[in-house]
Amino acid sequence: MFACRQLTLTHFRNYSFQRFDFTQNIIGIFGRNGSGKTNLLDAVYYLCFTKSSFSRPDVQSVKNGCAGFRIEGTFQKNDGSEKVVCILRENGRKEFSINETSYQRFSDHIGKFPCVMIAPDDVTLITEGSEERRKFIDTLLSQLQHDYLEQLIGYNKVLQQRNSFLKFASERNDWDESLLDILKKQLIEKGDFIHRRRLAFLNIFLPEVLQQYISIASHDDMLELKYDSQLMNVPFEELLQQNFQRDLYLQRTGCGVHKDDLDIRLNETPFKNVASQGQRKSLLFAMKLAAFETLKENKGFPPILLLDDVFEKLDEERMHNLLEYVCLNTSAQVFITDTHEERLQQAFMKIGKDFQLIGL
């Protein structure tokens, strides 16, 4: 059993001070737009990932007119409980602790409180560039393999250093070969590690996505999913040598695992070029539910599932199937937001499990 049982928000987004007690595993949160439904889910996400689900600085989560925020949560894990606290100080310093013991490195927290979120803007995972899909893969893999997260952090640091080196060298038309060689070796070591882990993981994960898509989609689609990486056919060292003059000219590293993507095709055509809105929704939910299943299998318990405004994305039948899947087939704690109390209540009553409604 893994669940968030209590959440206290102080000066977080639109909340001055609010405490929530979660007595059930199925929790519906209703209220008008702007009432704080998404912010509540984001607070739970913060406690799981040490950061917001939105790509924004921590300071933007501080309530207007306040200097910092505090998020405190109590999580049930099997028969015990753990207290997690995130504080943003007035000076912009963030502190994170578990059971009153502060983390020296926030990365040590990732994976201890697994979580999957489905939100309105997630369609960018399908429609936007490769960065969105890499972020999805990295967020999932980092919850599964801590050494992967450490190597990823290291890779991004070395990549930034190499890009700074290229800018300096390009502007002066001169560079230190020994420093370049050190950066190259570090980038290759970490990049090869990341590539091997992604390849091994995606060979298992992508078939799971495909199975989820088949069960969700009501049409007979020929969907193909493939890991797309420059390192699949050419060694990283060779790529760096081939691209050095171009990298120097552009002042950035143009090859490596930071360019990886998922090649998604529908009937042999790039998915985002031909897929309907319904097919895009189906693939989005397939990827998220595959992540949910992967975490559940790896951790031995299901992750917390945060569903933000999904009633607006799915028709009644698909919504019922989704709730039935996550609420009846697993013991997962599920948070669902909606503007309509009646719609939440009716949906929960149909699946026949105890639920809690919270109005904002």
Indicate residue ranges for each PLM-predicted region.
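Nucleotide-state sensing region of NTPase/ATPase domains
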Residues: 48-132, 141-144, 148, 206, ...
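Conserved NTPase motor "head" modules and their coupling/switch loops across ABC/AAA+ ATPases, GTPases
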Residues: 1-32, 174-304, 313, 317-333, ...
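A conserved P-loop NTPase coupling/switch region
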Residues: 107-115, 119-185, 189
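Walker B catalytic acidic pair
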Residues: 308-310
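Conserved lysine of the Walker
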Residues: 37
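Helix-to-loop junction immediately C-terminal to a conserved catalytic motif
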Residues: 45
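Structural recognition of the conserved hydrophobic beta-strand(s) that form the central parallel beta-sheet
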Residues: 73, 333-340
